[in-house]
Amino acid sequence: MSYSYAEKKRIRKEFGVLPHILDVPYLLSIQTESYKKFLTADAAKGRLHSGLEIVLKQSFPVESKNGQYELHYVDYQIGEPTFDETECQVRGATYDAPLNVKLRLVVYNKDALPNEKIVEDIREEYVYMGDIPLMTTNGTFIINGTERVVVSQLHRSPGVFFSKDDSEEGAFSARIIPYRGSWLDFEFDSKGIIWARIDRKRKFCATVILKALGYTQEQILENFSESKTITFNSKGFALRLDNLSNMKGELLKFDIVDAQDNVIVKKNKKLTSRDVKKIKDAGVDSVAIDFDLVSTLRVAKDIVNEATGEVIAYANDDVTESLLESCVEVGMLELEVIDFITTERGRYISDTLKYDLTRNTDEALVEIYKVLRPGDPPAAASVKALFEGLFFIESRYSLSDIGRMKLNARLGSDKVSKDIYTLENSDIVGVIEELINIRDGKGKVDDIDHLGNRRVRSVGEMVENQFRIGLYRVEKGIRESMSLVHKDKLMPKDIVNSKPITAAIKEFFTSGALSQFMDQDNPLSEVTHKRRISALGPGGLSRDRAGFEVRDVHATHYGRLCPIETPEGPNIGLINSLASYARVNDYGFLEAPYRKVVDGKVTDEIEYLSAIDEDNYVIAQASTKLDENNHFVEDLIQCRSGGEAIFTESSRVQYMDVSAKQMVSAAAALIPFLEHDDANRVLMGANMQRQAVPTLKSEKPLVGTGMEKIVARDSGNCIIARNAGEVAEVDSNRIVIKVDTEKSQTSNLVDIYSLTKFKRSNKNTCINQRPIVNVGDKVEAGDILADGFATDFGELSLGHNLMVAFMPWNGYNFEDSILLSERIVKDDKYTSIHIEEFTCVARDTKLGPEEITADIPNVSESSLAKLDESGIVHIGANVEAGDILVAKITPKAEQQLTPEERLLRAIFNEKASNVADSSLRMPSGTSGTVINVQVFENDKGGKSKRALKIEKELIDKARKDFDEEFAVIESVVKSSIEQEVVGAKIQKAKGLKKGAILTKEFLATLPFSKWLEISFEDEKLEEKVQNAREYYEEAKIAIDAKFEAKKKSITQSNELSPGVLKTVKVFVAIKKRIQPGDKMAGRHGNKGVVSRVLPVEDMPYMEDGTPVDVCLNPLGIPSRMNIGQILEAHLGLASYGLGKKIEKTLEKTRKAAELRKTLEEVYNSVGDKKVNLEALNDEEILTLCDNLKGGVPIATPVFDGAKEEDIKSLLKIGGFATNGQMKLFDGRTGKPFDRHVTVGYMYMLKLDHLVDDKMHARSTGSYSLVTQQPLGGKAQFGGQRFGEMEVWALQAYGAAYTLREMLTVKSDDIAGRSKMYKNIVDGKLTMNVDVPESFNVLRNEVRALGIDMDFDYSSEEE
């Protein structure tokens, strides 16, 4: 087994028995693949049925109303973005690129005859069609400078669905849902009548739709019912028994007798195949029936007197005596009737036709028009156009390929081609037929929560739909422009206005429900947000009306959606996460991978199955035991089939799970011993990992699952080598790799990776990358070169390993509180850096422009000490609450001055009183260090000193970076040429003869530019040198071009909002240590609040004097049933013990042979998966041992983790008791505790619920306008509400003075509170109470009722 660069430094011991069959697919592919399909910019000529291309093809050509112009689509191009991703974030711009569409305007001769078109001219050009946001490499969008994610939506798939309303007997319904267009419903009522609805409007008879399609009443009956022939004469009535086989299974309503009056089949019996044979053998072809039965029948076809052409009866008329008499009169002795006798099937349509008052197609169309457009007078043309536009015109109605596939599959017919996306007559007839079958018990209703009936709409598809909406508006505009613009040489640009497209796309990305501000607490929260699947949003469910069934876990979720990870609260079950191995197929259905089983042997062939396909197969679990030939060991195997768990013979198994973790999401797969935790707690654990704050120093989990490196790799926060090579240069800002051209298919000799330093994330956490490679290290493509935030050697590291004791300590563990050791604070274990962005905007006001200046009235020198001459804070300044960050003055209205004031103004040249200080200050309760300042201003007034200084610094840095980059390229080219040419024969060189041997010494005397002029006799060598020469020249040109582009983007003017003159952004880094009140959690849903930070000497300690780091309450485990944390603590202790063992060996010797023995015992004595230590050389073994001193990292995959015996064995090797318990001593008294305590290492996280962000106090502040009471909440700088129940409490104590204070001066007594503030300032401790404002509000409300209420002061005066 080969190890990557990072793995060699720290190998994770892996438990788990199951073989590794399939790598976890790229976690962000659901985002990147979808948008790639939409844009397909890199495969311009191969664009077929995807995204932009198909929308443009469907929308064009556009024809003018008079037919003179036609605008055709030819091709499109996506340009280059103006700024790169980083630049867009800094400037608050959108990362997008212009879309240019090539359009062809065909002009026809207007004098030509009506039916002939003579082309007069063709004009073609590229037309700008708005900007399309581009996706970053990590699957996000940058919109107005902020990173956003478009969440995929799970919605009802287009197609037909049959359901039953349980509130009413027989209330079955069918709904045809298109991808785009009107919904069509058919439903039964309790009487058996079939009704139709269009777009959930007023219902009408279903037969109206059939008539509107052109069917006559006779054809409708023929399609939906059987007919039988009745003969009649003087003896009575007889029913002909033709098509006997069709009557099988039906209930007979009469006796069948033979010629001798023997009963063959009795009345009220279901007809069987044997009965049919008996009837045929007896030669019975008809059976006598009485008139009572005949009178319940209806005519199947129109009855016409052939002699006169007169209609005696219409189809569906009741059979009556008078009708029979009329038939006898014209000599008709047999009658074709609808078969209600042997089957009830025809009655539904027949009864519906009785309710239907329309008689033909025209009347049916008018009826539909009245339903959809009530109040509009129906004109013949508009009536037909409306109906056709509903379901039969592709621009307005589309089932899409998914809808057509689902409709054909559900109706079990392929009559309609899969390329037809509108409804056909046969579709509607088929749906009604299937609905009748379901009502008759011959079909099943659909399960709407089955993942075969729900599909995923990803980002590309949503943007495509939005683009279509915009293009539809553009299309309307083009038609209008064609008829309005009168120009001799009309060009496509003149008639196309792209603003509707830009507006539609901008609206989607800025305010769409599924375009969300990216959750960026840590790399996991980013990955999870991009893999989220929401049932909410436009066209989806609403959380208020979603019932339990929709939210529940469904059998088809297995391997597709995670059954664990979903939010707590109103969105539970509506927002899900994609399972680790799941993918979305071309139709938008979720698929899960399985191993194919052939003749009882499990192969390594992988097949992805959708939920629909999976229903038909028997699938074994991943943990099913196999022998060495991959055959099943046991005869009876637990499997899944059709959504049920079953035991079945091994010969029946068709597929097998790929991995034990395939049913859970990436976040849940990070929880070790997940299988030992209660599901509710795992849900909390998975969600809380996303809230973990990245700490100053990242530390890998000692007990992991092996998923850590996959999440870290795919999150995009680490830097990954593009090509194999050698590390040439490393510093904190960049890594330079000299590429190994033999291993890598690239012409580049050098790869340069720039690192992100101290960048603010969406959640104000700090993004910082650190190199983990050293100069001279050999790396392969795909190796981790630098860690991102919350990663450690390429593994996700959200928290720290702490020594935990499960024991109470003086009540400080009450209600899940956590007791922490002061060592954790001293070692900065949970210290995190948060970067806050403060923005100051100078606007142009009515009274004049606001100004950012250091000259501010009535502000002391000390307050301005941290500002530069432009009035902006210096980088590196330590700022406290209330400090000025950006000094700004705002003009205020001029007041009338007395002559004396004017004179004083003139003498002292004072202009200060007509401006107000509106500076940006540091908010209360915060302090930190200024790490960056950005200034954006309009170029009209010229740039300020600070802006020019920042610009110069950025240009100098860019120049330095590019010079260094070129220097590296030059040195690499130089060394590669030197290796090849020293000792070669010269063809031509200044200072040497032809045929001379080139030496190192001669090369050293020449500048590098002269090296490139030397030519050689050896042709192959000459070719190599020529390639290096060309690469060098191209690199020089490319770097100069890159620098010029960078310089242009730095100096480019900023587009500020209207009325804004200048924007200053100040970034302040705030260091937050852990303190009481902060929330912490483990990975098993075991959360709590830090109650006290205890000095190290008071903490309980072990026999060797080692103090524990954390005390947790043991009562938090039994009722929560998350036993995984105990197992994690035990295994963590074993891991720590193994680390100590390696450390002791290192102290004794640094010989690789001895170390290998220890490592062999540590890694390979327990568990099935062995570590190949032979793959590491002696130096790598030493490095590995140095990195393992703190503990040997262990991977215990979910559902395939370490067993109890494994943990005990490891504890034994690590030198601990196998029960994981030990004697602890009280740090205060030195006495041992009464019982042994469970102690172990647990991975704990600090969550983004910090007490600093919640702590808040107020004396005076803002008040509500109406009630004049203080506002609420920290954001409004509000007060604490003293509510009704609190008032009762004070009343109960009789604290009258406190109560008066609370209800008046501290609340809404305006005059009283002003007076009180003045008294406090003056040092007087008296309180005057006035009328509270709430009384005035009440008085005004009573006045609204016409009652005047006022205080009566007369009694006091008397």
Swiss-Prot record:
Kindly list the GO CC terms recorded for this protein. DNA-directed RNA polymerase complex
Q: Which Gene3D superfamilies match?
A: 2.40.50.100, 2.40.50.150, 3.90.1100.10, DNA-directed RNA polymerase, beta subunit, external 1 domain, DNA-directed RNA polymerase, subunit 2, domain 6, RNA polymerase alpha subunit dimerisation domain, RNA polymerase Rpb2, domain 2
Is Transferase a UniProt keyword of this protein? yes
Alphabetic keyword roster: DNA-directed RNA polymerase, Nucleotidyltransferase, Transcription, Transferase
Matching InterPro entries, A to Z? DNA-dir_RNA_pol_bsu_ext_1_sf (IPR042107), DNA-dir_RNA_pol_bsu_external_1 (IPR019462), DNA-dir_RNA_pol_su2 (IPR015712), DNA-dir_RNAP_su2_dom (IPR007120), DNA-dir_RNAP_su2_hyb_sf (IPR037033), RNA_pol_bsu_bac (IPR010243), RNA_pol_bsu_CS (IPR007121), RNA_pol_bsu_protrusion (IPR007644)
Reactions catalysed, semicolon-separated, are: RNA(n) + a ribonucleoside 5'-triphosphate = RNA(n+1) + diphosphate
Q: State the top-level EC class.
A: transferase
Any matching Pfam family: RNA_pol_Rpb2_45
> EC number(s) of the enzyme?
2.7.7.6
Keyword Cell wall biogenesis/degradation present in the record's keywords: the answer is no
Q: Name one GO biological process term.
A: DNA-templated transcription
Q: Which family does it belong to?
A: Belongs to the RNA polymerase beta chain family.
| Subunit structure of this chain's protein | The RNAP catalytic core consists of 2 alpha, 1 beta, 1 beta' and 1 omega subunit. When a sigma factor is associated with the core the holoenzyme is formed, which can initiate transcription.
For this entry, the protein name equals DNA-directed RNA polymerase subunit beta
Organism equals Francisella tularensis subsp. tularensis (strain SCHU S4 / Schu 4)
